[in-house]
UniProtKB/Swiss-Prot annotation:
Keywords: Chloroplast, Membrane, Photosynthesis, Photosystem II, Plastid, Reaction center, Thylakoid, Transmembrane, Transmembrane helix. It comes from the Eukaryota. The chain crosses the membrane at residues 33-53. One of its GO terms (cellular component) is chloroplast thylakoid membrane. The lineage of its organism: Eukaryota, Viridiplantae, Streptophyta, Embryophyta, Tracheophyta. It comes from Agrostis stolonifera (Creeping bentgrass). This is Photosystem II reaction center protein K.
Amino acid sequence: MPNILSLTCICFNSVLYPTTSFFFAKLPEAYAIFNPIVDVMPVIPLFFFLLAFVWQAAVSFR
């Protein structure tokens, strides 16, 4: 529960003070080559969620 509360506070802080962006921070210069990978990473769990439905469709939703 404290983790959810602290995350909520962080989100509200990023809304109130948009100059310090929490979700859209830039990577350090040395890791700039990984920018395309980092942009796609939040979508990866959705692929697993969709894979569960495809798998169930393949086995006729047993």
